[in-house]
Amino acid sequence: MAKLNHSKKTLNNENFEAELQDRVNQAISKISGKSSTIESAISYALVNPGKRVRPLLVYLAADAIGLDLEKVDSLAVASEVIHTYSLVHDDLPCMDDDDLRRGQPTLHKKFTEAHAVLAGDAMQSLAMDLIVNDQNISADQKVRIISFLAKTIGYEGMILGQAYDIEFEDKSVSKDEIIEMNQLKTGMLLEF
């Protein structure tokens, strides 16, 4: 990916979005062709247009500390892949049971619930694979990043927040509980 034009890094910039989409497409191409349905499901989820806030934050943070933006491509794309996998799982009938995401049918509506679960799981491992295979990241940094991600998206983070979301459906909750749930589901991943 070419270095982003310093003066044009905004959420509404078409060049930024096109460059980021190119990186997402390259990430998708890492998936072998063993299951064309899963490949199609992952592609459908990732290319469905979103705001791409998380990758933008990765690039802005890198720029703020003077890093070459190309050196954080895998981190930026991984953040979007993880976010997308969380949305795929969140949309499932056993969770929020949403029919639309980003103006399109949710993945389990376009494909099947089983394919949505598998595609989400595959996106999680794809994000880790992007980081592990990035030659711009040292082995020590990879361990720290993967450890942080495991905590952030695992049972102490995003998954716990989703569990709270399910539990809160049937009871009255306080403002503090809602804030904690949102911090776990969304806020922790933004720290990435």
Name each model-derived stretch:
Residues N15, E19, I28-F192:
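Mg2+-dependent prenyl diphosphate-binding active-site environment of isoprenoid biosynthetic enzymes
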